[in-house]
Amino acid sequence: MNQQYSAMRSNVSMLGKLLGDTIKEALGEDILDKVETIRKLSKSSRAGNEAHRQQLLSTLQNLSNNELLPVARAFNQFLNLTNVAEQYHSISPHGEAASNPVALAKLFTRLKEKNFNNGDLKKAVNELSIELVLTAHPTEIARRTLIHKLVAVNTCLSQLDHDDLADYERNNIMRRLRQLVAQSWHTDEIRKIRPTPIDEAKWGFAMVENSLWEGVPAFLREFNEQLEESIDYSLPVEAVPVRFTSWMGGDRDGNPNVTAEVTRHVLLLSRWKAADLFLKDIQVLVSELSMSECTPEVRKLAGGDEILEPYREIAKKLRTQLSNTLTYLEKQLKGEQVLPPTDLLVDNEQLWQPLYACYQSLKTCGMEIIANGQLLDILRRIRCFGLSLVRIDVRQESTRHTTAISELTQYLELGDYASWSEEEKQAFLLYELHSKRPLIPHNWQPSAETQEVFATCKVIAESPQDAIAAYVISMAKAPSDVLAVHLLLKEAGCPFTLPVAPLFETLDDLNNAENIIQQLMNIQWYRELIHDKQMVMIGYSDSAKDAGVMAAAWAQYRAQDALINVCEKEGITLTLFHGRGGTIGRGGAPAHAALLSQPPGSLKGGLRVTEQGEMIRFKFGLPQVTISSLALYASAILEANLLPPPEPKPEWHQVMDTLSDVSCKMYRDYVREQPDFVPYFRAATPEQELAKLPLGSRPAKRHPAGGVESLRAIPWIFAWTQNRLMLPAWLGAGAALQQVVNDGKQDVLAEMCRDWPFFTTRIGMLEMVFAKADLWLAEYYDHRLVDKNLWPLGQKLRKQLSADIKTVLAISKDEHLMADLPWIAESIALRNVYTDPLNVLQVELLLRSRQQQYSDPQVEQALMVTIAGIAAGMRNTG
């Protein structure tokens, strides 16, 4: 094992020992001995010792009800600490960061070798746009209070990572680590109540405050240094290529808990938090900017010649304005009726202009080193976060708009809008969009659902323009779906044009996306409205649930390609918004690989992508990790735009068409046509029990009485991740690949794997899933939990998985899974030792829970802990 991994393993070992000491202190030697025995048996079982595997099973099966919870908690906490050690390893100078310098430096070297001139590079840098959308359905299982403790553990690991520590310093850090591990152990890791949408929004704001606020300026500083070194170019102060948006408090698709009032509250809360953070920043400037020499502009802003410390005076004025803004927003949040103060900050320019004048003045007066300190960081925060902190997207399902307009047209005795043809809908909508009179009568009393749709549009209309980023229409199926939202916003009196993004998420809708956008582009009124800019969202999770990963991936690729072509032809700047999840079954892939695997030209309009639940913490949970993640994104976008992958050959297209058709048919044959599938799914996974876990504010099902088709993509994936079959992430794909091999096209597949990033990524993602899947554990779930009549189905699926692994290895020409990514393989192996006992224990708990007439709180709690622990072990939930 090389030196890099040994540093991580020694951290894991140290944290494990501290946890062991804590358990011993809290519960005594016997429980610790039991936990240690289970851990050693698990390690030996993983190494292939069958006798120890049987011993592991019997030990866990025979735990008393009193032992269940401590054992489950021990392994859950082991995994949380392992993940911290792994996250630290990725940024440690003695770990992954030692051999993986910031990706940008390597890219600039490659571009120079390919004779790119600096002008091309500067243009690409100036056009760089990364918008990360923090989503509103956190699959983040860990409670916020525990996350704070784990972040503090990471800080301790960083402090220990020095060779020159004095003994007393090391002792102090170790004492702090022991305290943090003990605090975590004595804290209940499972939420007792579901978070509200406002709780979720606060979670997002905490992520900004604790990590992104420091991480973004630090990344831009690093990025700027790389640019100066490589191409002698400095990033303009006003150019901030990174922005953050949130769905928390704005995404009402299928979530009745997100109301117009909730959105209004979250928008106020967001502005309050921004004012609070900027106030702290400005306070630093008040204490630091004591210089007197300045330009006439700054002298005038400060209040004239008699002001001795002009920069400090300007900072003090801003401090007063921010303080007044904070007080006003606090009163509004409490529901008090209050008039806005005359110096209320509502526009980013109010903050930007005086500070930018100070920046220019300091540079002009020879104090560039001071200008480029804290002041520059604040200016960049204004451009990235602004007075809204994070903008929000509003998302709603298309049928809600149709129903609202239909209710209105029937009240006005114009007929039933919902039953009209697409042509009739468009004609009506365009007529009303051109009309100068209002459509909605003042005395009309709509239904509560329709009133909610109108109220949401009113909240948008009354918000500062920079507070709302876009209106996303889920399940968009026709041009009228887009026009309908524009009409609703017009009727609400929205004073600005909000980008409206149709979301195409089923196989049929993806295939029809080009046609819908082309129809919209043919409407003259629409063309004038959008100023040659269109956003389209591609849904990854629902398409994969609908058709399987291979067919969904190809439909997404083809839809993007077609949309790029239609927008290019029409002279439209297209922004593709990717609705990816953290898991493979929901489109997740390592960021760099995922971006390079998209169609050529897909990133010209910038990148807009959702960051889901627990992935937000893994990618952006610490300032240093934020720097690495943003550098990866920036590098991948620049590479994709400057060194686009070659257009795929027609033969590759044909092979993908075959793979898509064959895999989709097999996937649907199982999931939709196989009568035993739903009973098997419900028995072999903790799907029913998952509903009890207070995960996010959104219900697990769109329709409570429905089957698999009504399940949201997150619990669908989550359930299969728990029993280690990982079915949604591979079903159909391997069988389709084998069929193409049988058709004599193995050489073509090898060529695609070698030369086409899209296909290389598909194979790589399958390998990662196969590395996390586990045949014996999946079989164990079946034999203990599933009716014998359903065993043949499970057997068939496992046999298919086994065959698929061989097929993929034959195509990639690797001897074992993840051969190209030893670091990820190492990480999976490290966590398996702790995850396996949780899987075995979960089976036992499911069995006891399902057999009991009355629920036992200890069993229920232990079951929830195993669910959380396996999620931590798999590093994926939904």
From Swiss-Prot:
InterPro entries assigned: PEP_COase (IPR021135), PEP_COase_bac/pln-type (IPR022805), PEP_COase_Lys_AS (IPR018129), PEPCASE_His_AS (IPR033129), Pyrv/PenolPyrv_kinase-like_dom (IPR015813)
Cofactor(s) needed by this chain: Mg(2+)
Enzyme Commission (EC) number: 4.1.1.31
Keyword Lyase: yes
Described function: Forms oxaloacetate, a four-carbon dicarboxylic acid source for the tricarboxylic acid cycle.
Any GO molecular function: magnesium ion binding
Membership in a protein family: Belongs to the PEPCase type 1 family.
One Gene Ontology CC term in the entry: cytosol
Organism phylogeny: Bacteria, Pseudomonadati, Pseudomonadota, Gammaproteobacteria, Enterobacterales
Active site, UniProt feature: H137, K545
Name the UniProt record assigns to this protein: Phosphoenolpyruvate carboxylase
Keywords for the protein's UniProt record, in alphabetical order: Carbon dioxide fixation, Lyase, Magnesium
Species name: Photorhabdus laumondii subsp. laumondii (strain DSM 15139 / CIP 105565 / TT01) (Photorhabdus luminescens subsp. laumondii)
Catalyzed reactions per annotation: oxaloacetate + phosphate = phosphoenolpyruvate + hydrogencarbonate
Keyword set includes Magnesium: yes
